[in-house]
Amino acid sequence: MAIKRIAAMLLTSVLLLSCIGCAQDGRKEPGAEKTDLGLTAEVKPATDFTAKANAAVYDELDFDDKQEYEFATRGLIDAPETLELKDEDGTILWSQEAYAFLDDYEKAPDSVNPSLWENTKNNHAYGLFEVTDGIYQVRGYDMANLTVVKGDTGWIVFDTLMSVECSQAAMQLIEKNLGKFPVKAVIISHSHADHFGGIAGVMAKEDKADETLSIEEQLASGKIPVITPVGFTEHSVKENVYAGKGMGRRSNYQYGILLTPGVTGKLAQGIGMGQSTGTVSFMTPSYEITQSGEKLTIDGVELEFQLTPGTEAPAEMNTWLPQYKALWMAENCTGTLHNLYTLRGAEVRDGAAWASYITEAISLYGKDAEVTFQSHNWPHWGNDVVNDYMVNTAAVYKYINDQTLTYINQGYTSDEISNMIELPEALNKIWYTRQYYGTVAHNAKAVYQKFMGWYDSNPVNLNPLMPSDSAKKWMEYLGDVDKVLQMAKADFDKGEYQWVAEVTNTIVFADPTNTDARLLCADALEQLGYQAESGPWRNEYLTAAQELRHGNANFTASTKSTGDMVKALSAPMLFDYMAIVMDKQALADRDFTMNVILPDVGEQHMLRVKNGVLLVYADTLSDDADVSITCPKNALFAILTNNQETVAKAVKVEGSAELLTLMMENMNQFPITGANPFNIIEP
């Protein structure tokens, strides 16, 4: 029970959330009636300025070049006429049907950047596709792809989608068209949930090979090896737990969970149509690849692995299949500019290292590769095309890294660089390096952050006021807020949407009840969203606009978890999480030690709570601890969730049981449902 409780508590750390809009703080939600400035809370069409900005994209790019669409649709074997996956209660978990409106337009509507429209159409091409004879992909059944390689007697599966229900549907489509064969191995390319969450839809947990055996013994055992890059388990759970609630809330902005698909709503994300909301599973690997160049033969298929740590994920690897002259690029080349920084929040990625691993792949395999395929979007065929694809992708990441450093050394700040930097024209016009997911602007900020951190060296910015305090002082100095709003409305009518958003959001932070400021800010953000080429940027703008118009939202976890990822947390990770959720103020005057003995995993640790801080001493016990506990590792979940009934049954306590109770009672789990989540677009 404790594991189920903490699985629910941590669910938003890994998954997206669904929501129901509501007004907050008793504020009356604006309706269709007009304010003094003539504003309403309704969704608006594109303005003339936005329509012209989007129309100009047709002059910037070669829309007669249909190679990416041809690659996205090439090799189609089968696709259902409509695709909408539901759970047993009828809840929609994944839908391509929601994007059927794409067929109603000959060209992009005024409210959509035409380049993003092209990417959305390409990502709407779903079904079972042949990559080459013996390699097949199910695309469009989740944000990522499920790939199978035919061995002598069965399938080798590369990545398993986000949700069990989606991977089950994908495997059913494969079996319907290609026959039913056993799964001989599962290879997970990297440590993000949209690539491993559906594994229980591909194989049963009891069929996993014994990780204590050698890989040769695993393959001979008749069980299924689960093969990952080294560090997979640690990074799969760690990145999503420590800052999970913050990431979970921000993910709703990045992925547009509040938004309805449509020409004024959500479109593609650049690497797919969004994430599914089914059941997320997890299995620890039975075998880890620990060095580049390692070779395995599985069911007659030769595989050579290239580790690429610190690229798109902390633990990631490419795979070369020489018999097929096919190169699996994981998520290192995806047919779009990816993120050096993801908007939901995460550690920044190294653009130079990313480029270096791509060029290493070219050096190793580029001479022979006839097709590249990956975990998102579609393959690229032909040796010249493959090499150009990889070279150009590497060049974009390297350029952003190097040009940002050039500007840094010329004294420019992060905000200045993000406004200045542009790709060379030749790279900028390539469809598969366009900014559908990441952008040059925010990736440049990532490079700045990696090398310089948050501070721009201007002491005015060293210790600024709280945003709401600063906003109130601005309004105090400006005096007539109504006049400021009239000026902002005039600038809106001139198409100056970024400035209008900035000034009106300042008013919102000074006075969140100012309806004119909220609605004008929303209108400005909406137009910025319509102009955005990046799917996540569009989502960010439109989600903020919706929250300004209709208030914050109550959230409930829209996905289910098997709890396996939570069980994979090591004891040190659990102690780290305890330190995060512990009520530090309540324990600020306490100082005590606790020995923790975990016989089932052969570990012992000493914890010290000192002035509200939880310090962990690994592989150490105190001779005079205030309290000592002995329990299975999983019983730590009961302590974390203050499940005193389970603790009484599973935990042996010596010394001051009151201190254990005190610690448990001061574990502040972050709320998942009920009260509104933290604000983003307002104080």
Predicted feature residues:
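C-terminal motif of bacterial Sec signal peptides marking the signal peptidase cleavage site
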Residues: 18-21
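Feature captures hydrophobic
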Residues: 26-35, 490, 496-502, 506-509, ...
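Divalent-metal (often Zn2+) His-rich catalytic cores of metallo-beta-lactamase-fold enzymes
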Residues: 38-50, 336, 355-416, 420-458, ...
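Conserved beta-strand hairpin/beta-sheet module of binuclear metal-dependent hydrolase folds
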Residues: 121-182, 317-321, 325-331
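Metallo-beta-lactamase
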Residues: 130, 154-155, 162-165, 221, 227, 231-308, ...
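Active-site metal-binding motif and surrounding structural segment of the metallo-beta-lactamase
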Residues: 153-154, 165-225, 508
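Alpha-helical segment of the N-proximal tetratricopeptide repeat
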Residues: 472-503
